């Protein structure tokens, strides 16, 4: 196999604009100058074409392109023989496929844009893998022959014979109401029309949909839509169940309940596949894990299956021992939560807020007085609908301190690029070198700085919103769900960015967060919200991380232990020996190594 094939050229469809440039890539290419057609592009073309067989990998076109549309990537080892799918010339390609096993839950872990959703489409039979031959795709017989000798051969044979029924819970649940055009639009009508798994009542109980059965789907909130989507899939009989990010929008209690619903679908003959960015939920759900690595929206590679603990640790470590390959320059680590006490001595200013009762329609929130100091992060913990966002808004309205708030839902209305938005809203911070290196650079804002705000994806918008919130000059930062839409890697980076910024600028932050790993990483103290969601809730005064988490987890009836290698929190399986020991001792949350 020639060496040139281990290199791929990617041309971004969004950025490449031959009409607006002088074809610098073609003019500067040394291979074109020798008379070979390595780069073909004319002002009338939609996109440039780069021949990967002729390309010598000099990287001149990458530097010359005025729009930064070209990337030349040297692949690790020779993966050319293992291409599963490629969309078109100079576009994303996926290597290998995850191997589902009957009667077990397969978890997929990897960053955004690395091919997890593509892999799900292929395994569900909704897309035929073209083995990299996008111009001359193979037929199914050839695909099955290609996978011979692996566990996927039997799987694809069933797909070809139409013996397999696959159901996917989509990633973006907020698109569901638009897809439902006619007929009964109520929750119960839509689920009952398809339900054939004899578990309707049980699933309704576990997903807390009993009170919403007569409501129209168009009137559901994000968390309710997520539970509806999980229930709609779980009440149908199928051979393959696929859940794409089943925990977004849900609070910690609902995440664990959803996890139990998904695990209840297992039978000896069916397959369950889950894509999840909340690592503690993925850990709780899966029996084994495939890690995906590569360069987002350029290429993705699926590893062999690992045990859950080993797979997640490999992803965090950035190094695959079986392939002797490092795919990330540094490991993602967790500090121990009690190591935060080093900075307590420096805290000077103390602020207090009074007892207060807020009533909004049927909902009543009783706030107990409390206080906070500077250089401190307080995480608000509680179920959805217990008034965490209401508390943030009340703080913003009734305090003399300057407050910057990142709302829970981000609806962009700004006409223009990200750069224009930053220069308009947070000019001083954006032009400050320290803010650039501590906030913008780690959140990789550079990659999207010249894109239109209205065209950004959920994760990109979230990163822009975090930058905007931290860039405003304020005494108190209220950040509502900073982890939504971010992948596991970005979540850890975002929590490090927020923590470093708050401590260095000696400000206070109140953060609402449902991702357990992120909440424990960020919190110095916690405020617990208890009571009946949407009816009557109570906001307790701030308490230490250990006592707060212990009380919170006791209400959820869940215990956590720490992984000895990476120190990340792991959920104990319900009623396991460890679970019972910790409950008897009253230790629901562990801090020691």
UniProtKB/Swiss-Prot annotation:
Would you identify the family this protein belongs to, as annotated? Belongs to the ABC transporter superfamily.
This protein's record includes keyword Repeat: yes
Q: How does it assemble?
A: Component of the multifactor complex (MFC). The complex associates with pre-initiation complexes.
Kindly provide the name given to this protein in its UniProt entry: Translation initiation factor rli1
Give the top-rank taxon of the lineage listed in the UniProt record for this protein: Eukaryota
Location comes to: Cytoplasm; Nucleus
Quote the record's binding site residues for ATP. Answer: 110-117, 382-389
Its lineage opens with: Eukaryota, Fungi, Dikarya, Ascomycota, Taphrinomycotina
Q: Which gene encodes it?
A: rli1
Classification via CDD domains: ABC_RNaseL_inhibitor_domain1
InterPro entries for the chain: 4Fe4S_Fe-S-bd, 4Fe4S_Fe_S_CS, AAA+_ATPase, ABC_transporter-like_ATP-bd, ABC_transporter-like_CS, P-loop_NTPase, RLI1, RLI_dom_1
Q: Which Pfam families match?
A: ABC_tran, Fer4, Fer4_RLI
- Domain annotation ABC transporter: ranges: 70-318, 334-556
Give every 4Fe-4S ferredoxin-type domain span: 7-39, 46-75
Query: SMART domains annotated for this entry?
Result: AAA
């Amino acid at each position: 196999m020639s060496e040139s094939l281990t290199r791929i050229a990617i041309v971004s469809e969004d950025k490449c604009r031959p009409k607006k440039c002088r074809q610098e890539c073609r003019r500067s290419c040394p291979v074109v100058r020798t008379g070979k057609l390595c780069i073909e592009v004319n002002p009338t073309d939609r996109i440039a074409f780069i021949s990967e067989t002729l390309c010598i990998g000099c990287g001149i076109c990458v530097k010359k392109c005025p729009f930064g549309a070209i990337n030349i990537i040297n692949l690790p080892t020779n993966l050319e023989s293992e291409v599963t799918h490629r969309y078109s010339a100079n576009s994303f390609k996926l290597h290998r496929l995850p191997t589902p096993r009957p009667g077990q839950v397969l978890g997929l872990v990897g960053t955004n844009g690395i091919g997890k959703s593509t892999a799900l489409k292929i395994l569900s039979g909704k897309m035929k893998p073209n083995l990299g031959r996008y111009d001359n795709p193979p037929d199914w017989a050839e695909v099955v022959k290609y996978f011979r000798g692996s566990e996927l051969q039997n799987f694809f044979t069933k797909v070809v014979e139409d013996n397999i029924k696959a159901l996917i819970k989509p990633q973006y649940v907020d698109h569901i109401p638009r897809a439902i055009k006619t007929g009964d639009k109520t929750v119960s009508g839509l689920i009952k029309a398809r339900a054939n798994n004899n578990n309707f009542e049980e699933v309704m109980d576990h997903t807390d949909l009993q009170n919403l059965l007569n409501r129209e789907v168009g009137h559901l909130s994000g968390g309710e839509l997520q539970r509806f989507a999980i229930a709609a899939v779980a009440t149908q009989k199928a051979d393959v169940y696929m859940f794409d990010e089943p925990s977004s929008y849900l609070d910690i209690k609902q995440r664990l309940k959803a996890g139990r619903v998904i695990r209840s679908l297992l039978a000896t003959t069916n397959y369950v596949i889950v894509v999840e960015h909340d690592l503690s939920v993925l850990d709780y759900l899966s029996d084994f894990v495939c890690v995906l690595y590569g360069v987002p929206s350029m290429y993705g590679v699926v590893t062999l299956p690992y045990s859950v603990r080993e797979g997640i640790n490999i992803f965090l470590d950035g190094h695959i021992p079986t392939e002797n390959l490092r795919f990330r320059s540094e490991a993602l680590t967790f500090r121990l939560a009690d190591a935060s006490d080093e900075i307590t001595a420096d805290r000077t200013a103390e602020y207090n807020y009074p007892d207060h009762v807020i009533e909004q329609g049927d909902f009543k929130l009783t706030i107990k007085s409390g206080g906070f100091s500077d250089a401190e992060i307080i995480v608000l913990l509680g179920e959805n609908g217990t008034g965490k966002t209401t508390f943030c808004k009340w703080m913003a309205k009734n305090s003399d301190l300057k407050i910057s708030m990142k709302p829970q839902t981000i609806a962009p209305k700004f006409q223009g690029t990200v750069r224009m938005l930053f220069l308009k809203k947070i000019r001083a911070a954006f032009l400050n070198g320290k803010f650039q290196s501590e906030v913008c650079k780690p959140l990789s804002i550079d990659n999207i700085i010249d894109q239109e705000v209205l065209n950004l994806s959920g994760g990109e918008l979230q990163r822009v919103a975090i930058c905007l919130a931290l860039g405003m000059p304020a005494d108190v930062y209220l950040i509502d769900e900073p982890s939504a839409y971010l992948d596991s890697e970005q979540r850890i980076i975002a929590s490090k960015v927020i923590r470093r910024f708050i401590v260095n600028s000696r400000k206070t932050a109140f953060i609402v967060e449902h991702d357990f790993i992120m909440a424990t990483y960020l919190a110095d103290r916690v405020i617990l919200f208890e009571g009946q969601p949407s009816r009557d809730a109570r906001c307790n005064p701030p308490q230490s991380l250990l006592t707060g988490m212990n009380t919170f987890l006791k209400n959820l009836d869940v215990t956590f232990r720490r992984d000895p290698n990476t120190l990340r929190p792991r959920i104990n399986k319900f009623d396991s020996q460890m679970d019972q020991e910790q409950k008897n001792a009253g230790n629901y949350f562990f801090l020691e190594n």
